[in-house]
Amino acid sequence: MTHTNLAKETLLQFMQAMYSWERKATRSLRNQADKEMLKDELAAIFDQFCRSKKTLREREVSLSVRFPFDYKLETHPIVDEEYDGNQTYLYIKENRSGLETLYRFRMVFQKGKGWIDKKEWLDDGKWINSSL
C-alpha cells in the first residue's frame, strides 16, 4: 500500500471514529459520569490515530462538539492530496451553510503506520494551526 493510500485510510478511519464519538457526545455531555467516559474514549481515538501533540488534542480538555459535526464523511470530503517525502497532505473541504473552509491534514509515517501529525485551516491564503 502506498503512503498516500495508507494516509487516506488512516484519516478516513479517524473521521469515522470521531463522527461516532461526536454523535455520542451530543447525547451524553450533560451527565458528569459520561464526561469521564467520553474523555477516555476520545483519548483512545487520538492514541490510535494521532501523534501525541498537545496542540492537536485540545478537544480532550474541552470535550467540545459542533453541529453539524466536524467529521461527517459525507459533508467533509477529501478533495486533494500531496505526497512529500515521508509525509502526505490530505485536503478536506467543509461547507457550513454556504461557507466553505479548506482543511489540511499532515500525515506522517512511522513503523509502517500513518499518523495524523497536524491539522490546519486556510485563512486568507495562510495555513493556520487547528486542533482536532
Label every model-predicted segment.
Residues 1, 35, 100-102:
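Short, charged low-complexity linear motifs
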Residues 2-25:
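Short, aromatic-enriched amphipathic alpha-helices that serve as compact interaction elements
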Residues 6, 10, 37, 41-45, ...:
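Exposed alpha-helical structural elements
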Residues 14, 78, 90-92, 105-107, ...:
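Hydrophobic beta-strand residues in large extracellular and virion-surface proteins
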Residues 17-58:
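A structured, charge-rich N-terminal accessory region that forms the first stable segment of a protein
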Residues 41-100:
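Surface-exposed, charged secondary-structure patches
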Residues 100-131:
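Short beta-strand edge/turn micro-motifs at domain boundaries
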